[in-house]
């Protein structure tokens, strides 16, 4: 069995690229400002931001949440039920991987063999999520997609990007941007397949929901996100028994397990903060929820609050062409 050593480090300065000033963790008098204090201040500020859908006349009032931007969308029609800064450019972190894996599922068969180059393995940031694959080893595409969606493995994302582009993982960015445009995205620019920090890699709550409409329509990908354990058996292509637990708390057995969940993907970097894109279905209505620049565990709580708001206040009805009114 392969054991993993995951490095962790604390960033002393967070550079805000999108109009937010640099936050320093040292007070001028020499006292340290705690991360908890900064987190609480971020939450309080985000909760004070306007929810644009609440300004619509006779629209059900949506919940106050701690995400900087968020959206609740009907998956089938694209109707927006809740809107909070939905076109604001945000860093997606690992929620990027729903686009990467969607493209892979559309372009590749699950039994294709993916080679791991030196660059794919070593271009990831220290301490970022990985499964400790070595250069020269191979996995099937199905194993790769499971590793990406269950473990959020960054080196696997690079390898899949190289496999699809036929060259370098950097060239995969053009493929991502082309597909995002086809899906209706209007605020995004992608430069890597895993969401590792880059000022030129951004999206919005609206765009993630649009990508989510295609991603969550794929039953195989949804099933992967809901799988409790990543288990890759040793083979002639790689020698180790790889096992990793899915840490997603919305899935069955999680602390915030949501009974109507269809699938989900989290993301986190110091700048992006906590992001989450998810889908739930109840009584024939399928909703997609995106929360961005949130905090942990608030992003779980906010997601549940938004799903509950949607299922409690809206329903889909079929209206005959001969009818002019429909009473609910």
Model features per residue range: what roles?
Residues 33-206, 210-219, 282:
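Active-site-adjacent loops and short helices of periplasmic peptidoglycan-processing enzymes
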Residues 185-186, 197-202, 206-328:
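Domain-terminus/edge residues, biased toward the C-terminal soluble/receptor-binding domains
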């Amino acid at each position: 069995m392969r054991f993993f050593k995951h490095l962790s480090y604390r960033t002393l300065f967070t550079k805000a690229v999108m109009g937010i000033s640099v936050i320093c963790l040292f007070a001028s008098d020499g006292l340290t400002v705690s991360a908890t204090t900064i987190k609480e201040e971020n939450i309080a500020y985000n909760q004070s931001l306007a929810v644009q859908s609440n300004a619509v006349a006779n629209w059900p009032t949506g919940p106050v949440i701690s995400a900087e931007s968020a959206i609740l969308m009907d998956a089938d029609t694209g109707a927006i039920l809740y809107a909070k800064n939905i076109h604001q450019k945000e860093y997606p972190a690992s929620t990027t991987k729903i686009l990467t894996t969607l493209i892979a599922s559309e372009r590749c068969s699950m039994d294709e063999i993916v080679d791991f180059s030196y660059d794919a393995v070593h271009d990831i940031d220290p301490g970022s999520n990985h499964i400790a694959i070595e250069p020269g080893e191979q996995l099937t595409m199905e194993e790769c997609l499971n590793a990406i969606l269950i473990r959020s493995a960054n080196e696997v994302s690079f390898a899949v990007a190289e496999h699809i582009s036929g060259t370098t993982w950097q060239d995969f960015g053009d493929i991502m941007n082309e597909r995002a445009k086809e899906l209706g995205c209007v605020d995004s620019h992608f430069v890597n397949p895993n969401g590792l920090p880059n000022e030129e890699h951004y999206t919005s709550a609206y765009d993630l929901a649009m990508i989510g409409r295609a991603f969550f329509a794929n039953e195989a990908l949804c099933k992967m996100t809901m799988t409790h354990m990543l288990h890759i058996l040793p083979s002639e292509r790689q020698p180790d028994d790889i096992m990793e637990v899915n840490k997603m708390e919305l899935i069955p057995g999680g602390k915030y397990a949501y009974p109507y969940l269809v699938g989900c993907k989290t993301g986190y970097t110091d700048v992006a903060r906590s992001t989450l894109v998810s889908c739930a279905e109840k009584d024939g209505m399928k909703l997609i929820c995106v929360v961005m620049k949130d905090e942990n565990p608030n992003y779980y709580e906010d997601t549940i609050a938004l799903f509950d708001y949607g299922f409690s206040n809206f329903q889909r009805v079929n209206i005959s062409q001969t009818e002019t009114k429909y009473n609910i």
